[in-house]
A protein has these predicted regions:
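Conserved binding/recognition cores within well-folded domains
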Residues: 3-105
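DNA major-groove recognition helices of helix-turn-helix
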Residues: 64, 112-113
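Hydrophobic helical membrane-anchoring modules
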Residues: 101-103, 111-112, 118-119
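Short, charged, intrinsically disordered terminal tails
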Residues: 117-129
Length: 129
């Protein structure tokens, strides 16, 4: 049990330290994934909303989605990749974040988003024990 608890703690710490390198017009920003609320795709740009503000970079959300789902992010809509850490509530057609922002959820993704959020929340409840 002790080994398993230590292993879970190490995995949690490693996830907390993941960084997204964002090439902006001003230069390169290094954003810890744990500080990113969501990423919104708009045409050929990605708007990255984080705890200290937002930034923008060129790119496709599909390129980030494959990697970021391993670190607590879920695609709620073709335009949004959301950090489950900041999700307060999943409604029929939207997700409410802790800060009150509302983001779209596709009808075909609502059930999957709810299930994954429950799994995510349970993993933290067990990690805290």
């Amino acid at each position: 049990e002790l080994e398993e608890a230590i292993s879970n703690l190490i995995q949690k710490l490693e996830k907390d330290e993941q960084i997204l390198e964002v090439q902006t017009k001003q230069g390169i920003e290094f954003l810890p994934l744990k500080n990113i609320l969501y990423i919104e795709s708009c045409k050929h740009y990605l708007r990255i909303r984080h705890v200290d503000g937002e930034c923008e970079m060129r790119g496709k959300i599909s390129n980030l989605e494959k990697w970021m789902t391993n670190y607590g992010f879920i695609q709620t809509h073709r335009s949004y990749l959301v950090n489950m850490r900041f999700m307060k509530m999943v409604r029929t057609n939207e997700v409410e974040l802790d800060n009150g922002e509302l983001l779209s959820v596709s009808r075909d993704k609502v059930q999957d988003v709810r299930e994954k959020q429950m799994i995510y929340l349970r993993s933290f409840a067990y990690a805290d024990n």
